[in-house]
A protein has these predicted regions:
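C-terminal structural segments of small proteins and small subunits
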Residues: 40, 48-52, 56-74
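Thiotemplate assembly-line natural product biosynthesis machinery
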Residues: 1-18, 72-74
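Phosphopantetheine carrier-protein modules
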Residues: 10-28, 47-58
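General helical structural elements
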Residues: 8-10, 42, 64
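Residues in well-ordered alpha-helical elements
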Residues: 3, 18, 27, 37, ...
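Amphipathic alpha-helical interaction surfaces in cytosolic regulatory modules
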Residues: 33-39
């Protein structure tokens, strides 16, 4: 799952998959809120999950996205 999510994030950011680190701050990588929303929508569709809007605002890095995916799979 993590590899695919890294690919999605890297694709939207226009960066290499290797540049998407667990704790790298998305804002420092140049991500804006619209890009984050597009990423979340793709992830929701790919994994057939729903992530609440109030959870999205707390996403700061790749590890945060993975935690939300795991939480919503449960």
């Amino acid at each position: 799952m993590e590899d695919r999510v890294r690919e999605i994030v890297a694709g939207y950011m226009g960066i290499l998959v290797s540049e998407v680190t667990d704790d790298g701050n998305f804002i420092e990588l140049g991500m804006d809120s619209l890009t984050l929303l597009k990423i979340i929508i793709d992830i929701e569709n790919e994994y057939d999950i729903s992530i609440a809007d109030e959870e999205i605002v707390d996403i700061r890095n790749f590890a945060d996205i993975c935690k939300l995916i795991e939480k919503n799979f449960s």
